[in-house]
Each structure stands twice: as structure tokens, then as C-alpha cells.
Amino acid sequence: MNRTKLVLGAVILGSTLLAGCSSNAKIDQLSTDVQTLNAKVDQLSNDVTAIRSDVQAAKDDAARANQRLDNQAHSYRK
């Protein structure tokens, strides 16, 4: 009975140690993946910021062009 408990305890302890070693490698890999994803998120955030300013400039240009067209249309109607 005691020997069975000792063997069972040794098997559980060995399994835990082996699982712990593989988990460290997986944790390191996941940590690297998270860092990579964080860098990509930062890059995408910068890209979105740049695109927002480009979109605003395009909207402003379109508004000016529409205003010029409206002014020309009013001058033809007179």
C-alpha cells in the first residue's frame, strides 16, 4: 500500500516536472507571440492615425471643390 502510494506520487511528481518544462517553452513562445502582436498593433495604430489625417485632408479638398462647383453653377444661373 505504501509502496503503491510512493510510486504513484513519484509518477505524479515526474509528470508535473515534465509538464512544467514544456510549459516554460510554451510560455516563452506565447510571450514572444504577444510581443510580436503588440508591435503589429502599434504599427496599425500609427497607420490608422496617418490615414485619418489623409482622409480629413481629402474631405477638405472635396468640400472646397464642391464649393467651387456650387459657385460656378450659381454664376451660370444668373
Curated annotation (Swiss-Prot):
Task: Please list which residues make up the signal peptide.
Answer: 1-20
Biological process, per Gene Ontology = lipid modification; periplasmic space organization
Q: How does it assemble?
A: Homotrimer.
**What InterPro entries does UniProt report for this protein, alphabetically?**
Lipoprotein_leucine-zipper_dom (IPR006817), MOM_Lpp (IPR016367)
**Single Gene Ontology MF annotation:** peptidoglycan binding
Where is it mainly found?
membrane
Protein's job: A highly abundant outer membrane lipoprotein that controls the distance between the inner and outer membranes. The only protein known to be covalently linked to the peptidoglycan network (PGN). Also non-covalently binds the PGN. The link between the cell outer membrane and PGN contributes to maintenance of the structural and functional integrity of the cell envelope, and maintains the correct distance between the PGN and the outer membrane.
Where does the record place a coiled coil?
Answer: 22-75
Under what name is this protein listed? Major outer membrane lipoprotein Lpp
Where is it localised?
Answer: Cell outer membrane; Secreted, Cell wall
